[in-house]
Amino acid sequence: EQVVGVTVYRWGGNRCIGLSGHVVGVDFPSEYSDWRDVEPVELVTAEVEKRPTQENIVAALRRMARNASHIHIATDYDREGELIGKEAYELVREVNEEAPIDRVRFSSITDREVTEAFADPDDLDFDLAAAGEARQIVDLMWGASLTRFLSLSARQLGDDFISVGRVQGPTLKLIVDREREIDAFDPEDYWELFADLTKDDETFEAGYFYLDDDDTEADRVWDEATADAVYDALAGASTATVAEVRRRTRTDDPPAPFNTTQFIRAASGIGHSAQRAMSIAEDLYTAGYITYPRTDNTVYPEDLEPRDLLDALADGPRFGDDAASLLDAEDITPTAGDEETTDHPPIHPTDELPSPADLSDEEWEVYELVVRRFLATVADAATWEHLRVVATVAGEEQDPSLKANGKRLVDPGYHAVYPYRSTSENYVPDVEEGEALALTDARMEAKQTQPPRRYGQSRLIETMERMGIGTKATRHDVIQKLYDRGYVEGDPPRPTRLARGVVEASEEFADLIVSEEMTAQLEADMQAIARGEATLDEVTDESREMLARVFDRLTESRAELGDHLRDSLKADKTVGPCPESDHDLVIRRSRHGSYFVGCDGYPDCEFTLPLPSTGKPILLDETCPDHGLADVKMLAGRKTFVHGCPLCAAEAAEEEPDLVVGSCPECGEDGGGELAIKRLRSGGRLVGCTRYPDCDYSLPMPRRGEAELTDETCAEHGLPGIRITYDDDGREPWDLGCPICNYREYQARQAGTELETIDGIGEKTAEKLKQAGVEDVSGLKSAEPDSLADEIDGVGPDTVRNWQADAD
């Protein structure tokens, strides 16, 4: 049924309403809303007020609560869920002071666990909720005041304001610091030497090694003359004598259960970003297939019966054989990690089993990862046999030593059910000490030391966890916001020039903004609130004092800070030299909101280049060898793409021949116009009339992929079908068919109100969107991604942008 436009589920005398995330938020009073009229420092001491963020849900909840005899709060079982529950509690109490209110907690949405949770309810944890509220207030104070200060100082307002926050700043500094290490790295030359050894026609590779000054084995030779001497000795020898043979057996223990961080790490290994992995996991949890995906726990609770879950999996079609093989064991003892908490169990499958047909390919891939991790935790250890062989060579000036390490998987153990870890073997034949081996093909390889690797998303999350930056529930969202704001690009994330400028300015004028100690201390304070050892007011007052000290330093250096940021912003937008003047080409924005490349010498020089209409441009480090212009990348969610050199793109668009499709329906047979696939200077494409501008009839076309005509002809319009093929990413060809029919179908979809026509939006997600006030595709397209994402659990701004891109 509908209550004030909100879907409510009814059975018997019970009614259930979904809150769809926070329904009440914190904000500053309206008199602080004008960025230009209010000094940012005033926000440090400004009072914070609560206000409904989803008024329709609030109204529905109040109406239902007035006559309710009993209220159960069953929000997510974590800090944010407890705060959402407290928001509901306070709204109910405004209209109903008598009805009992209890708290129901569960970690998986299965019939058994939900039924048991409602049979044994608890009280709301107001301390835990206060910790969540403290986080809200602190994030608002730091984020709003610092974002306004930096943006105003740099005169960078509108959609391109400079965003900063208490968790975002330290995370960005981690990425920038690593990039500085890479830039400052001075590679050193070294050499490695190898030779092939043979016994009974079985050849294996051995590497040269020596003992360094610390009596430790080393295989890198830092002096070229020494490397040459070793090579001469190896190349001049025909045999090597076995000096040492060592055999050992190694136990390879199964992995610990998944917590959030380790899940993200494993998901990245199969190609999923942190944000995408968590989004999929949230959907699987909501569908009842896995337990709650936000957890620090790596120890299964005592009430989890692995054998029962294996029985359920054994009855399923996809994991039955693997689960059945594990049930044969007399004793099933799961592994345990180092972290044990009492809120949520580690991530594992429930006994609600989907089939591949129930899930998308991505969802099934992540679900299988979770299932197989559980199977691995109750499987036996694997066993490896290792063989180390050391052989010496008799040379004229020195007797170099060679070593080879062989390994063989004797018992696969958990690897049989968990194929995500390497089981590659290295064969070395059995030899005996004193045995002579034939030596052939000596070789020397010149190498250089490599700079430290950039943080991959999963490793960045692990580092944030170790340093106390953010929480299990927020770290992946923080990284996604860095992408959304244009602070990082690529994977692994690489800082843009703007990111460097913000970090440099923060370090110089107020280093607390990017200090991990500050955000880690605040996280510790919030945990103290949850334990009842501190109060919300104590923590927020402490945070105000810290923020006031930051503003003392910032205010003293406002002019210098603004200059520094403006220089960084200009560098971040400078594409390269203008071909028609002595000025630079920079990325600009038209008064209509679209991006283009224009000369910094305007109006004296009016040279411009178009940019694609989809996405937000950022500059890459790669430079066009022909024009000296930086390559441009367009950020557009999952449809992000590299546009390349804007001058090359414009020239290519002008040179690309049109592909004639057929007669133009506007011109008619006597008009002589033909429809052709045309490439625009912006990089886009359309099907348009060859008589343009006399005839401006056109139809949209996908930007990417190669267009070709098919043999099938439209019976209604007499036009051949169009097929789009993709050579670079393995996607299946897209048969558009007749371009006129295709466009009519597109218009029909756009005119519709069905949200589920968008890829990634199923029935449950569509319901969440409607509860957040988005009723149809048109409403989705006009929504502000960050605001909408804040209202829907498990959905990030990038996901919203992907939906909007699909809707376009």
Report residues per predicted region.
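Basic, low-complexity terminal or inter-domain segments flanking catalytic cores
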Residues: G13, L91, D296-T753, E775, ...
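Intrinsically disordered, low-complexity regulatory segments
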Residues: E1-G132
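Alpha-helical scaffold elements adjacent to nucleotide-binding pockets in ATP/GTP-utilizing enzyme cores
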Residues: E1, A60, L83-L91, E113-A117, ...
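C-terminal extensions
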Residues: Q750-D808
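C-terminal or mid-to-C-terminal helical accessory/interaction module adjacent to the motor/catalytic core
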Residues: T53, N67, I109-L197, R247-R248
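Conserved, well-folded catalytic cores of nucleic-acid-processing
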Residues: H22, M64, I71, L91-V95, ...
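Long, highly charged, low-complexity internal segments
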Residues: V6, G13-T53, I162, R166-E282, ...
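Core structural elements
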Residues: R135-T147, A195-K199, T249-T260, Q275, ...
